[in-house]
């Protein structure tokens, strides 16, 4: 076991004392960094970058060379599982992800198999192993997956969507077909995340990007129950340490209590909820991650520091159970120096709350 030089992120997720609030950023390895653009150009395209362990490790570590972040997150994509199921993923210029073989009926669902994490998805595990080696114990490595509901939206819609009409049509007209798909996806996510943990991920996160488009009843039926199944199926101890699990539903602020009741260790918050309210509701059960609006990074350094100070004050003096993050991924045109102001502000301004 490599001894971690900085385990504040893991300790905060387990509500253990830390000397300052740890911070990382969703999409911290990405297009706002010129060095990322150079490495992606070297790879040729996005999926080639994901599938090259050395280059995936390089881009994972790039933000850590610039900023004193408290965790690294695997460089990959949430759509690796549907791609491995044979849906024909490609990234079209200006369109984002497109599946050439989307799910349209029950027969399509029945014919897809569960990908082997050390087979079709071995490139992801190779990247995890390479990143752990290259990190050399500096900070923990976060593994991740999309949630079954979020993966299903892309698989049924055939790509990104604004209205989600195809998947909602399936949900209301053929609910059993959708449940069959979600159940297969939940099993795949369990296998995938457990393989990441065995390969070296020290914490895992499930991104439910599109759970917030559902009614409260449908959220529980079609999204949350499958995330609950995942939490129940995950390896929770590895290499002598607990492996914390974070669930994040974008626009899920009305369901915090239900998310916290799944048995996860932490709940991710987007910027539409006040962190003091979230703490009052679920802070006795789980750690909280979040939740500055990523667009705040367009503001002046003074305004960024002011926002960080306000969120820290909202979480308050308890001193445990908060991982600072953005409420969603960093935007591609944010000046890197503003991200630096953000990270430094979290470290500096949080220290008085941890005495």
UniProtKB/Swiss-Prot annotation:
Gene3D superfamilies for this protein: 3.20.20.210
Q: Name one GO cellular component term.
A: cytosol
- Residues marked Transition state stabilizer (site): 77
Supply the alphabetized keyword list.
Cytoplasm, Decarboxylase, Lyase, Porphyrin biosynthesis
Lineage runs: Bacteria, Pseudomonadati, Pseudomonadota, Gammaproteobacteria, Vibrionales
Write out the function statement from the record: Catalyzes the decarboxylation of four acetate groups of uroporphyrinogen-III to yield coproporphyrinogen-III.
Q: How does it assemble?
A: Homodimer.
Specify which residues bind substrate according to the UniProt entry for this protein.
27-31, 46, 77, 154, 209, 328
Protein's name according to its UniProt entry: Uroporphyrinogen decarboxylase
Q: Quote the SUPFAM superfamilies the UniProt record gives.
A: UROD/MetE-like (SSF51726)
Q: Give the main location.
A: cytoplasm
Task: Give the family this protein belongs to, as stated in its UniProt record.
Answer: Belongs to the uroporphyrinogen decarboxylase family.
Q: Which InterPro entries match?
A: UROD/MetE-like_sf, Uroporphyrinogen_deCO2ase_HemE, Uroporphyrinogen_deCOase
- An example of a Pfam family matching this protein is URO-D
Q: Which PANTHER family match?
A: METHYLTETRAHYDROFOLATE:HOMOCYSTEINE METHYLTRANSFERASE RELATED (PTHR21091), UROPORPHYRINOGEN DECARBOXYLASE (PTHR21091:SF169)
A GO BP term here is:
protoporphyrinogen IX biosynthetic process from glutamate
Q: Where in the cell is it found?
A: Cytoplasm
Assigned EC number: 4.1.1.37
Q: Which gene encodes it?
A: hemE
Query: What's the catalysed reaction?
Result: uroporphyrinogen III + 4 H(+) = coproporphyrinogen III + 4 CO2
The terms under GO molecular function for this entry are: uroporphyrinogen decarboxylase activity
Which pathway does this polypeptide act in? Porphyrin-containing compound metabolism; protoporphyrin-IX biosynthesis; coproporphyrinogen-III from 5-aminolevulinate: step 4/4
């Amino acid at each position: 076991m490599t001894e971690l030089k900085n385990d504040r992120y893991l300790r905060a997720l387990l509500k253990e004392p830390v000397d300052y609030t740890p911070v990382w950023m969703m999409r911290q390895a990405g297009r706002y960094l010129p060095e990322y653009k150079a490495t992606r150009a070297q790879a040729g395209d996005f999926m080639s970058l994901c599938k090259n362990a050395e280059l995936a490790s390089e881009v994972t570590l790039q933000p850590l060379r610039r900023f004193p972040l408290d965790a690294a997150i695997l460089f990959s994509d949430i759509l690796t599982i549907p791609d491995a199921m044979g849906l024909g993923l490609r990234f079209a210029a200006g369109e984002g992800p497109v599946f050439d073989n989307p799910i349209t009926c029950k027969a399509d669902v029945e014919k897809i198999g569960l990908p082997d994490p050390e087979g079709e998805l071995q490139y992801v595990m190779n990247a995890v192993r390479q990143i752990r080696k290259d990190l050399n114990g500096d900070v923990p490595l976060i593994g991740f997956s999309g949630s079954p509901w979020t993966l299903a939206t892309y698989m049924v819609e055939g790509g990104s969507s604004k209205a989600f009409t195809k998947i909602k049509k399936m949900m209301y007209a053929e609910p059993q077909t959708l449940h069959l798909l979600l159940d297969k996806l939940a099993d795949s996510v369990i296998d995938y995340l457990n393989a990441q943990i065995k390969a070296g991920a020290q914490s895992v996160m499930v991104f439910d990007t599109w759970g917030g488009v559902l009614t409260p009843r449908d959220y529980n039926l079609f999204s949350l129950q499958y995330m609950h199944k995942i939490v129940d199926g995950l390896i929770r101890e590895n290499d002598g340490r607990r492996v914390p699990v974070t669930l994040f539903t974008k626009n899920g602020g009305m369901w915090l209590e239900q998310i916290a009741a799944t048995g996860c260790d932490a709940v991710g918050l987007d910027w539409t909820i006040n962190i003091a309210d979230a703490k009052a509701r679920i802070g006795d059960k789980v750690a909280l991650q979040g939740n500055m609006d990523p667009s705040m990074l367009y503001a002046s350094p003074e305004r960024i520091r002011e926002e960080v100070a306000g969120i820290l004050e909202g979480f308050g003096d308890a001193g445990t159970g908060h991982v600072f993050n953005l409420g969603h991924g960093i935007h591609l045109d944010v000046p890197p120096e503003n991200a630096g102001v953000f990270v430094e502000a979290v470290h500096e301004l949080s220290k008085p709350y941890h005495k």
